[in-house]
Structures are given as structure tokens and as C-alpha cells.
């Protein structure tokens, strides 16, 4: 890695530590040329493949923005949204693939959002699953009730 101070093409790792709950590695480096130290943070790249075929980096902020829209007017705070985004990223990373289709990100959002707020879940699901009629909502509400029955009894 190039030194950011003198642009020397090599550096030595002095210390490495996990950070961001194991999602990144913080490395302290030393330049053999100028002797200055600097820090780098390394993360595994996770890319989302959109329907159009375009690939873009996974963004927790984009997850939060989409879910926040569904939660508009609901009693959902920023901490809950941040936790949901972390759960979604963890689920997507758990697939082990460096690239995931955008529909898998949407699926990963649905479960935690259902547990967080049912109304927000229905709003998000209606857009994600392209509801076209009240019957689509009715089917989803029935599935939601069935899920509640299973979680209460189990």
C-alpha cells in the first residue's frame, strides 16, 4: 500500500484489529521510507446486482432510506432502523457470495421489518411484491396473521 505522505509504494503492517463487529479490519501501518504511520480499514466488498444488470456496492444507508419510507408516520426510531440494516447486511453477507441480486436484499429486509412494525412491513411488501389489488393485501395480511400464530405458539 502506498504511503499517503511520501507515496512510497510499500508499507509494513504494525498492528491489525477487527472492527465494526468483525466486518472490517483496522490496520496500523508504517512507511519504511519516511517512518510515518497511518491507518487503513479493510472491508470485504459486497455488491448488489440490480434488475438492469448494473452492479453497485451494498449500502446500509440505502436500506435505511427505503425502510424509513415504509415507516413514515410509525413509531420506529433510528436505532431500530440501524439495527435492521445491520441484520440485513449480516443476512446478505451470510450467503457467502460477493454479489447478490437486489431481490435477495429485499427478501432480507422483509423478515426483520415484519418483526419491527407490521404496518411498515405491509407498505414495504406492497411495493416490493408489486401489489395490484386489495386481494394482494388481504393475502399478505393472512400470511402475517399465520406467522403471528406460529410465533406465539412456538
Curated annotation (Swiss-Prot):
Cofactor needs: Zn(2+)
Keyword DNA-binding: yes
Domain ATP-cone residue range list: 46-136
Gene Ontology biological process terms from the UniProt entry: negative regulation of DNA-templated transcription
Superkingdom field: Bacteria
Pfam families: ATP-cone (PF03477), Zn_ribbon_NrdR (PF22811)
Keywords attached to this entry: ATP-binding, DNA-binding, Metal-binding, Nucleotide-binding, Repressor, Transcription, Transcription regulation, Zinc, Zinc-finger
InterPro entries: ATP-cone_dom, NrdR-like_N, RNR_NrdR-like
Zinc finger (unnamed): 3-34
GO MF: ATP binding; DNA binding; zinc ion binding
Job of this protein: Negatively regulates transcription of bacterial ribonucleotide reductase nrd genes and operons by binding to NrdR-boxes.
Record protein name field: Transcriptional repressor NrdR
Gene: nrdR
Amino acid at each position: 500500500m502506498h504511503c499517503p505522505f511520501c507515496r512510497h509504494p510499500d508499507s509494513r503492517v504494525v498492528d491489525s484489529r477487527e472492527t465494526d463487529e468483525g466486518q472490517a479490519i483496522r490496520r496500523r501501518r508504517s512507511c519504511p521510507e519516511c517512518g510515518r504511520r497511518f491507518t487503513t480499514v479493510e472491508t470485504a466488498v459486497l455488491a448488489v446486482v440490480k434488475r438492469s444488470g448494473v452492479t453497485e456496492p451494498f449500502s446500509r444507508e440505502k436500506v435505511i432510506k427505503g425502510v424509513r419510507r415504509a415507516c413514515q408516520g410509525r413509531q420506529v426510531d433510528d436505532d431500530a432502523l440501524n439495527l435492521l440494516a445491520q441484520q440485513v447486511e449480516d443476512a446478505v453477507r451470510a450467503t457467502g457470495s460477493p454479489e447478490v441480486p437486489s431481490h435477495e436484499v429485499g427478501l432480507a429486509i422483509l423478515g426483520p421489518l415484519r418483526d419491527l412494525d407490521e404496518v411498515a412491513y405491509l407498505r414495504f411488501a406492497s411495493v416490493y411484491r408489486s401489489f395490484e389489488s386489495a386481494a394482494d393485501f388481504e393475502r399478505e395480511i393472512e400470511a402475517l396473521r399465520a406467522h403471528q400464530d406460529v410465533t406465539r405458539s412456538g
